[in-house]
Amino acid sequence: MMKKYSLTTHSTETCQILFTSVSNVFKYIPSGTRRILIMYQDSVSQVLPIFSAASGVQCYRYLIPDSESAKQLGVAEQCWRFLAQNNFTRSDLIVSCGGGAASDLSGFVASSYLRGIKVIHIPTTLVGMVDAAIGGKTGINLKEGKNLVGSFYSPYIVLCDPSMLTTLNEEHLKSGLAEIIKCGFIQDESILSILEHNAQDHMDCSQRVCAETLPPKLLEELIHKAVSVKITMVDSDFRDTHKRQFLNYGHTLAHALEAATSHKLPHGQAVSIGMVYAAQVAFAKGLIGRNILTRHERILETYGLPICPPEVQWRNITPYMQRDKKNMQSNDTDSDKDSREMPQISTQSKLVLLREIANPFISSVSHTVLLKAYEAMFPQ
């Protein structure tokens, strides 16, 4: 049975998030569409035969790189040129098939080509289903940091088919679980309780739970809970000025670690480490007790996610943390200053922290506390 969510992205626009078979995609193609560009990753090429059944629509395929390699300006330019060379118009359509990087890139390409053509996302990873494809954020990376160039652009439809997750490997499932667990910490504590209860039944001799052993019905329940959390936060703050930023819990350090390691650290692992770090910061500031910090470590480690950063020196991380989007707001109120003067490097960074579970807020934290919390994450 199909399940549907509605997400209001602008005052006059609503994005439908549909849980149904991917084979139903042609039911939702906008009328008048003559051309479709399918931007896909090699790992999901098995989806392509579905589009060969299109009637009256010309389908083009465009293979994009896997993972963060797709999110480059050069790749976006190649896509724009392909669209132009094949005479795509505003009445045509892009369909993305793949993980979070596929929806990030295709959304950015769609938002900028001809100043906007429709895009449908078909997320095929757990991260894509619960996070990246939902909410209208698009982005590509620069050497200076992750997702520094992008737009807010609502997809026409997001089509989620949980049956596609059955072929995901353990690492991809764990990455998605990190985003689901994040939703438990910032809003819906029942997510944490479900995972903790499941761990009691499926823990192996190493005190770990293999993500691949999650019962399909349980995984689908967790997906719907995480999607509901994201919709609640995006619906009231599409342009990411306040409440939506809570979805960045754990992401300040995560994005910095990804950039500092040249994206060798998978996103979900980085988010896991970032959440433990945010809990360490909150604990250092006296906002939460050790019990909440320990709960972070226990649930993430139980599901095979890392809780300790790789060996990356603090001085290599701080430049990326300072470029975090939450810090990109001018505090300069002196009108006599030369507008060309370079701003001073802040001695603080903004992080999403918890006062308690499901009670997030944004806090400015001194670099002294940030360093102390980072050092506390390494075994003594």
Curated annotation (Swiss-Prot):
EC number in record: 4.2.3.4
Catalysed reactions, semicolon-separated: 7-phospho-2-dehydro-3-deoxy-D-arabino-heptonate = 3-dehydroquinate + phosphate
Localization per Swiss-Prot or TrEMBL: Cytoplasm
The record's free-text note on cofactor binding: Binds 1 divalent metal cation per subunit. Can use either Co(2+) or Zn(2+).
Obligatory cofactor(s): NAD(+); Co(2+); Zn(2+)
Chain segments carrying region Disordered: 320-343
Annotated NAD(+) binding sites: 100-104, 124-125, 137, 146
Record keywords: Amino-acid biosynthesis, Aromatic amino acid biosynthesis, Cobalt, Cytoplasm, Lyase, Metal-binding, NAD, Nucleotide-binding, Zinc
Gene Ontology cellular component terms for the protein in this record: cytoplasm
Gene Ontology MF, one: metal ion binding
GO terms of biological process kind: amino acid biosynthetic process; aromatic amino acid family biosynthetic process; chorismate biosynthetic process
Pfam family, one: DHQ_synthase
Domain of life, per lineage: Bacteria
Residues annotated to bind Zn(2+): 179, 251, 267
Pathway: Metabolic intermediate biosynthesis; chorismate biosynthesis; chorismate from D-erythrose 4-phosphate and phosphoenolpyruvate: step 2/7
Family: Belongs to the sugar phosphate cyclases superfamily. Dehydroquinate synthase family.
Function: Catalyzes the conversion of 3-deoxy-D-arabino-heptulosonate 7-phosphate (DAHP) to dehydroquinate (DHQ).
Listed name of the protein: 3-dehydroquinate synthase
Organism: Tropheryma whipplei (strain Twist)
Higher taxonomy: Bacteria, Bacillati, Actinomycetota, Actinomycetes, Micrococcales
